Structures are given as C-alpha cells and as structure tokens.
UniProtKB/Swiss-Prot annotation:
Cited Gene3D superfamilies: Arginyl tRNA synthetase N-terminal domain (3.30.1360.70), HUPs (3.40.50.620), Isoleucyl-tRNA Synthetase, Domain 1 (1.10.730.10)
Enzyme class, broadest EC rank: ligase
GO biological process entries: arginyl-tRNA aminoacylation; mitochondrial translation
Similarity section: Belongs to the class-I aminoacyl-tRNA synthetase family.
Protein name: Arginine--tRNA ligase, cytoplasmic
One cellular component (GO) term of this entry: mitochondrion
A family per Pfam: tRNA-synt_1d
Keyword terms: Acetylation, Aminoacyl-tRNA synthetase, ATP-binding, Cytoplasm, Ligase, Nucleotide-binding, Phosphoprotein, Protein biosynthesis
Region named Interaction with tRNA: 59-60, 106-111, 484-498
Length: 607
C-alpha cells in the first residue's frame, strides 16, 4: 500500500505548494480538505477574515452545477456590508491557481469549481494505490466506541425492528472503524426473564432434542407458542402452584437463585441460539465481538444502582414500588419505575446496571444504542438517570433511532425470522435472474450470487431513506434491477469488473502512470469530481449517523459511470487513451466497492 501521504507527495511531484493545514483537516487523505485549506488561505488574504472562520463555513453544494464547494457570505458575519456585493468583489479577485477551474458569485454565495485535471492527477493515483483504504482517515487517536445493535429476544421472532437495528448498527460499526475508532460490536440479547421458565416447562412437554440441535430458534419459538396456548386454555381453572404459569414462575425462581440444573438447560437454549445467530449474521457480513444480554447484568450491579438512586435522593416510594421522578429535570420524561413492589427490578434498572458494568470493563469514549424510535422515551429516561447519578461518561451515550418497517411477511405467514427473510429473498432473486437465460448461463455459482444480490436488496431498501422514516417492505421494488436498488448497485459493480476483464492486456501497474490529461470529456470530469468526494461523504455520515448519505452518493456515482459508457470507450482506442479511461473506470469500481463494503454488502464479480 502507498503511504498515506500519497496526496501530498503527489503535490510535491507536481511542484505545487501545499496550503497551510487547518485544524481538523486531513489533506493527506481527503482532497476536499486540501481544497478547503487552499480556499480558506486565499480568501483570508482577500477578505481579511481569519481562515479558521472560513474553513468551517465552506459547504457542499447540492448539485455540481453550483460548484464543488460554496461559502454563504452571511456566515462570516461581516457587519455593515452587503453579502452580494462582497461575493462579487471577492470572486473577481480570487486566484484559481492549480487548484480551481473557476470561481463564481451567485447572490450571497461564492461557488468554487475544482480543476478536474488537477483532481485527476491526485485522486485517481490515490484511489488506485490505497485501494480498500481509500476513504478511511484517522479522525481520532486511541478512542473506543461500543455499538449495541440487533439485540433480539431468544425464542421470540426476529422482527423488522431487529432487522433495521442490525443493518444500521453494522454500517455504523464499519464507519467508525474506517474513521479511526476502536469498535466493540455488542449484541445485547433478551435472554432472561419469566419466559425462560415457560420455555423450560414447555420443553419438558413438547421439546425434541433433534429439532433443538437442528434449528434452535424456530424450535424454541414453536415450544413457546404451544406452552402459551396451554396457559390460555387453563385460564383460572387450576390452582396457581399446579398451573403451567405457576410451574414456569417456580422454574425461573430457581434460575434466579442460581440452581445449577435449571441454569444448565437455560445455558443450552442460549448457546444453541447464539450459534444459529452467528451463521445468520455472517450472511450480512456482521461479526460480534460480544454477545451480552440481560442475564449478564449482575445482581450486584442492579443493587448498586438502586443504592445509588437512593443515595442521590432520586427515588420515592409509591405503594411499595420505587420510582424516580424525572420531571424535575425534564418535564417530558415523566416518572420511571425502577423496582416493583415485590422487589424485582425492571428493564430500566437492568440497563443502568449494564451501562455501569460496561464502563467499568471497557472504559469507552462513546457508547451508541441502535434502538427503534418507540424506545425514545426509555432511552431519554435511562440517559437522564445516569447523568443524575453523577456519571461523567453519561454525556458520551447516544441513541441512534429509526422508524418502523411496514408489511414485512413471508409466503408462509406473518411470523418472520431473519433467516426466513434472507432465504425468501434469495429464492425470489434467483427467479428474477433465471428470466435472462443468456446471462444466467454465464454465472458460475448462481445460487450464491442470488443470495448476495438478494441481501443487497433488503439492505439498500432499508438504508435508502432517512433512518427515522417508516418504510414499506416491497418485494417487487426491492428486487428490481431498474431504479435505485441493491441489485442495481451489484449490477453496476459487476459491469465495471467486466470492463476491466475485457481490457486485461492493460495491467493495473500501467493505470497509475496513465496520462490523465487525456480525460477531457465533461462526463469524465464530472466522474473525477465525484470520486474525490468519497472521503468527505464518510466524514459527513459519521456526523449524522445516516446510512443514506453513503447510499445516495453511490447511486450518484453509478449513474455517472453509466453516462460515461456512452462516450468513454476503451475498446478500439489508442493504448494511451484506453489506459487513462481504464484507470478512471478502475478508480470508480474501487470507490463503489469500498462504499458497498462499508454498507455491509458483498460486491459480486459477475451477474
């Protein structure tokens, strides 16, 4: 791999002076930062405004017709001056140098257009040498983040909310890693509670050892459904201690008291379920560092939490239950029960205990909970309680929320498990692929490709809009190769691969030393400008925690590549021109590959 100073060493090769480096900028790995530094430095000389105020005021444009960066003059807060007049004066005086093609005033804005020739000489070699590392940047030093995501309940369906948490959390974990954080991926399972008493009693009645080993998640769910049916049918006709409910309570009590025999069965259920989850998550390119769960929160931590609540004067009793009145700190937060009248703790207390345990163990710099927006109140109460307990690290907790998925069900009915969704997507994708007989005949492992493309369909549909928005799960739209879908991204990647294969006589070593000044067409210039944006897209995504930032960028990129095919031919050109164009396509494929991997997809080579 080339050194990360590649961009700056390239500047030296071109005998171009490097602009002064602004705070929090990374010009060695981000061309847009290099441009920001140049613009800030030069605009400061013209305007007399400090460059440290100009740098953060530079914004992305919403269309490339408005340039690559713009500055709204009102953001500089210059008293007594007309922003439109200043924009005109400063734009006229601005030196384009090697960096810019033109500078234009547009109302109270100045628009800066990067020089595509200059960009090509820096960006294309940078992408081709850094490969998978292009886009990554060490934004922080020695910082640790825990990301808790997915968190299904054992023996209950893995519903749409878990799917969204898994996809968004997987993306965030990859993003934080790319930008220099040490990431701990954590799955906090619903693996404790009275339902395990029910499961144990149910397993004695309806369990099957072979079925448990073969498919623990479905089998335990079937047992759970049947035992709940028994409870329903019994009603109040049997004395509590003889009833199914009574036996389940008694069993869970044994678990809570540490009875080895009771815990042995529970451990088997938990371990088998985790093994099955590991396989399913692997299909989404997710590997957890820690499988935690409600069961892992020690009794000591919860008792310590309740003692601390009392010590800080946060609690009061009501009919034997212990409550915390949070309205004193924020009227919207209401009152939270932390201990029931029978002395048992609630989910909230368990979460507080878990957070305390985690800080003790990992000393994280940040902890992110990827949980549905229905839990907004719960998360806000939980964070406020930790803050009022006096924990300095409470400010480092963040809730990344998301909306609902509507209409997710399979052919066989409405109870949905993640592996059912993935299997059905694979089958449907396979059916779609078979319709094109010629292409289908060329695919070496069609089922494997159908699986990867199908998974892309599910994931892109989920990440396409802002995460807070609800969306409808639509098979037809999702599996289409037309429009902005996962299969379209896969198709775009495989087509770029085929361009490379068809010109295999021109080696990748030649690409880096190509004459990029031959890339003169407007379509090529636009593509080069887009490729330079990728590192900045990642930095923007970490501010908003929005996967759609990356998804939208990848669709822009693939649409532009598609426009290039009509005008930038490789076949039948002189070797010099073919090499330059091939280098551009190779760089575009690398950036598309990097973006797809970041989102959790596996790009396919042929389809």
């Amino acid at each position: 791999m080339a050194s990360t100073a590649n961009m700056i060493s390239q500047l030296k090769k071109l005998s171009i002076a490097e602009p002064a480096v602004a705070k929090d900028s990374h010009p060695d790995v981000n061309i847009v930062d290099l441009m920001r530094n140049y613009i800030s430095q030069e605009l400061s000389k013209i305007s007399g405004v400090d460059s440290s105020l100009i740098f953060p005021a530079l914004e992305w444009t919403n269309t490339m017709e408005r340039g690559d960066l713009l500055i709204p003059i009102p953001r500089l807060r210059i008293k007594g001056a007309n922003p439109k007049d200043l924009a005109v004066q400063w734009a006229e005086k601005f030196p384009c140098g090697d960096f810019l093609e033109k500078v234009e005033a547009n109302g109270p804005f100045i628009q800066f257009f990067f020089n595509p020739q200059f960009l090509a000489k820096l960006v294309i070699p940078d992408i081709l040498t850094r490969k998978e590392d292009y886009g990554s940047c060490k934004l922080v030093e020695n910082k640790k983040v825990i990301i808790e995501f997915s968190s299904p309940n054992i023996a209950k369906p893995f519903h749409a909310g878990h799917l969204r948490s898994t996809i968004i959390g997987g993306f965030l974990a990859n993003l934080y890693e790319k930008l220099g954080w040490e990431v701990i991926r954590m799955n906090y399972l619903g693996d404790w509670g009275k339902q395990f008493g029910l499961l144990a009693v149910g397993f004695e009645r309806y369990g099957n050892e072979e079925a448990l080993v073969k498919d623990p998640i479905h089998h335990l769910f079937d047992v759970y459904v049947r035992i709940n049916k028994d409870i329903e049918e019994e009603g109040d006709s049997i004395p509590l201690e003889q009833s199914t409910n009574g036996k389940a309570r008694e069993y869970f009590k044994r678990m809570e008291d540490g009875d080895e025999e009771a815990l042995k069965i529970w451990k088997r259920f938990r371990e088998f379920s985790i093994e099955k989850y590991i396989d399913t998550y692997a299909r989404l390119n997710i590997k957890y560092d820690v499988y935690s769960g409600e069961s892992q929160v020690s009794k000591e931590s919860m008792l310590k939490a309740i003692d601390l609540f009392k010590e800080k004067g946060l609690t009061h009793e009501d009919k034997g239950a212990v409550l915390i009145d949070l309205t004193k700190f924020n009227k919207k937060l209401g009152k939270a029960i932390v201990q029931k009248s029978d002395g048992t703790t609630l989910y909230l207390t368990r979460d507080v205990g878990a957070a305390m345990d985690r800080y003790e163990k990992y000393h994280f710099d940040k902890m992110i909970y990827v949980i549905a927006s229905q839990q907004d109140l719960h998360a806000a109460q939980f964070f406020e309680i930790l803050k009022q307990m006096g924990f300095e690290w409470a400010k480092d907790l963040q809730h990344v929320n998301f909306g609902m998925v509507q209409g997710m069900s399979t052919r066989k009915g409405t109870v949905v498990f993640l592996d059912n969704i993935l299997e059905e997507t694979k089958e449907k994708m396979h059916e779609v692929m078979k319709k094109n007989e010629n292409k289908y005949a060329q695919i070496e492992h069609p089922e494997e490709v159908a699986d990867l493309v199908g998974i892309s369909a599910v994931m892109i549909q989920d990440m396409q809009g802002k995460r807070i928005n609800n969306y409808e799960f639509k098979w037809e739209r999702m599996l289409s190769f037309e429009g902005d879908t996962g299969p379209y991204l896969q198709y775009a990647h495989s087509r770029l691969r085929s361009v490379e294969r068809n010109a295999s006589g021109i080696t990748q070593e030649k690409w880096i030393n190509a004459d990029f000044s031959l890339l003169k067409e407007p379509a090529a210039k636009l593509l080069i400008r887009l490729l330079g944006q990728y590192p900045d897209v990642l930095r923007n995504a970490i501010k908003t925690h929005e996967p759609t930032t990356v998804v939208t960028y990848l669709f822009k990129l693939t649409h532009q590549v598609s426009s290039c095919y009509d005008v930038l031919w490789v076949a039948g050109q002189t070797e010099e021109l073919a090499t330059a164009r091939l280098a551009l396509y190779g760089a575009a494929r690398q950036v598309l590959y990097n973006g797809m991997r970041l989102l959790g997809l596996t790009p396919v080579e042929r389809m």
